[in-house]
Regions:
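C-terminal motif of bacterial Sec signal peptides marking the signal peptidase cleavage site
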Residues: 33-36
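Acidic/His-rich structured neighborhood in mature extracellular/periplasmic domains
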Residues: 107-278, 284-287
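Sec-dependent signal peptide recognition
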Residues: 2, 21-27
Length: 287
């Protein structure tokens, strides 16, 4: 079994913009599927550890082919090449039923015939026809992270189109990027559902920080999230954001908790990033 963390639109946007707001996460247990009859070889975890480049798997293109034209071969590739991603999409994001239901594929196709969703698919595929910049940025980022946190696994990344519900989906082996949540702060449809503050983080430039933040959060979770205080959560998220700033080589995230972590690390230069993220004594950040 593996854990998959779904990060809701409001959780992602609020986390990135205001540290004092809560992140809402729903954790779902998902069963492994047999992948022995794959049509192609997917990149394995840790591939970048050997020097290879990260390349976002274009699951979204198969989605687009099936959901806009009913192309059965695209559906077959979704099921065979990406069984876990397809199950997660159907059962846990769209909540359409069980993936082995004989009618599930027809149900999914009909669900996406909504004119708004068809527009999202078309616009996402147009904006993200090329993702070379994101591939390069992810490769550079994880090479830096591996130097600082050698035991960190390098996940497989894939793109998908959901329904504006989720931005990033994280498991122990993969990170899913919902392209429909990154169409730009001025994307017309967003104004109907999101505040200006939320829309400011729904851009292409936020994909890399989001991926890094939430993957690190999954690998270094806060202990006793439900029972710990809000200040403890804020400091924990501040640590994650501070590390992401270092990876990005710029202060993408700001705020009092990131600043507190920065002051602490300046005074404790021998402390490793792993030690920083694994230590849950938040009193040490108080000055």
């Amino acid at each position: 079994m593996r854990f998959i963390i779904f990060l809701s639109s409001f959780a992602v946007d609020n986390y990135l913009s205001v540290m004092s707001k809560r992140i809402i996460v729903a954790i779902t247990l998902v069963l492994f599927l047999c992948t022995g009859c794959e049509w192609k070889i997917k990149p394995s975890i840790g591939e970048t550890e050997t020097g290879s480049s990260i390349k976002v798997e274009r699951y979204d293109r198969l989605q687009s082919r099936y959901l806009t034209t009913g192309d059965f071969s695209a559906l077959q590739q979704m099921s065979i090449n990406y069984p876990m991603e397809t199950r997660t999409l159907i059962e846990d994001i769209l909540k359409l039923g069980q993936v082995n239901d004989p009618e599930i594929n027809k149900r999914m196709l009909n669900f996406y015939q909504d004119s708004t969703l068809q527009t999202l698919i078309s616009d996402a595929e147009a904006q993200y026809a090329n993702m070379d910049d994101i591939n390069n940025d992810l490769t550079t980022a994880f090479k830096r992270l591996k130097k600082w946190i050698p035991n960190l696994k390098v996940p497989m990344f894939y793109a998908q189109i959901s329904t504006l519900d989720q931005s990033i989906i994280v498991s122990d082996e993969a990170v899913g990027i919902s392209l429909d949540k990154y169409l730009g702060k001025d994307y017309p449809l967003y104004a109907k559902y999101y505040s200006e503050e939320q829309r400011s983080s729904m851009t292409r430039n936020n994909i890399l920080p989001d991926c890094l933040s939430f993957y690190l959060l999954s690998q270094f979770p806060i202990k006793g999230f439900d029972s710990c205080s809000q200040i403890e959560r804020d400091y924990h998220f501040g640590k994650i954001q501070w590390v992401v700033n270092k990876v990005l080589e710029k202060n993408f995230f700001n705020g009092e908790f990131v600043s507190a972590v920065d002051h602490y690390m300046q005074d404790h230069k021998t402390e490793t990033y792993s030690q920083l993220l694994e230590n849950h004594d938040y009193k040490r950040f108080l000055r």
